[in-house]
Amino acid sequence: MVTASSSVRVSNEDECFIYDIEQLKDNVVVSYSTGSWSCFDKGTLLEIFKVPKAHTNITGIISCDQLNGVITCGSEGEIHLWDIRSQAKSAVRSWTQQSTPFTCIALNKKNQFATGSELTRSLASVQLWDVRSEQKLIRQWNDAHNDDITHLQFHPKDNELLLTGSVDGLVSLLDTTKEEDSTDPEEDPLLHVINHGASIHLAKFVSKKRVMVLSHMESYAMYKLKRDKDEKTWSSNELFSIDDLRAELSCSYVINEVSTSDKQFCALAFGDFSNHETKFVLVDTSTGELKKEPTKLERASEEICRAISFDVKNDVYYSGGEDGLLQAFRV
């Protein structure tokens, strides 16, 4: 059992939940249910600065190392780029899409970022933006899903490929170079669709050809993704699946996928309502099969853990949840 090497309560406000934890080189940034976010020193967990009320409800936060920044999005339809070097005194750039509640965000290595939206006026859309410009969005796709977008991730090697997940139970692969509504079938941006059958919590590339999917009902599967020889069509097949991870892992909920120091594996973090522990199960990124991991984190309360992140370089886990505590665990 690993106990916390340092802990900090992120706010004096009642019911201030930690939503997400993102890592920078020397810092971690944390978003809250109050619409605020803070930057902490990785080693000491001392708060360096706080951005109060950055959004009405902050729904996504990602690091942008190329610009020494952080990008956030919110349910009020705003996106902001913040400069860490100036302690985020004000947003460096902002983007707005009227009446579009953003739900999630992802960044590629070409300084482009994607956002997903709630179902609004019968449309659940995915947008592509240029982080270097406040001009209008590059592209928007409305046909990939028919309910709230819940998760986005760019391919680890191909910056033009975007994986999207939704409440509709579908995981879609988009070519972000292509426009929607093209009359040429070969120019269709929707390359492939996986029907997982339940609202998507997580849809993530764990390698170039493997996609892990986890639903809000805790159903789990690993899919092999294949580009056919003509390089115009894609296919997938399920390698491994579990109907309910709660029964398999004897837990109450699954938190998220986290990196490991071994590239053959990633891990799933999970918790239980009846104790303080956060546990892990290793996932073979080639087969999707699960392997027991002995590491356990003893958190400071029994409140639900909402976010966890692993610093591979320094062997430190960062966790946070509905107790409002940010904790570091050195393993």
Curated annotation (Swiss-Prot):
GO CC annotation, single: nucleus
Swiss-Prot/TrEMBL keywords: Cytoplasm, Nucleus, Repeat, WD repeat
Localization, UniProt: Cytoplasm; Nucleus
WD repeat intervals: 53-92, 97-139, 144-184, 300-331
Signal peptide (UniProt feature, chain positions): none
Domain of life: Eukaryota
Identification of the protein by name: Uncharacterized WD repeat-containing protein C63.06
Source species: Schizosaccharomyces pombe (strain 972 / ATCC 24843)
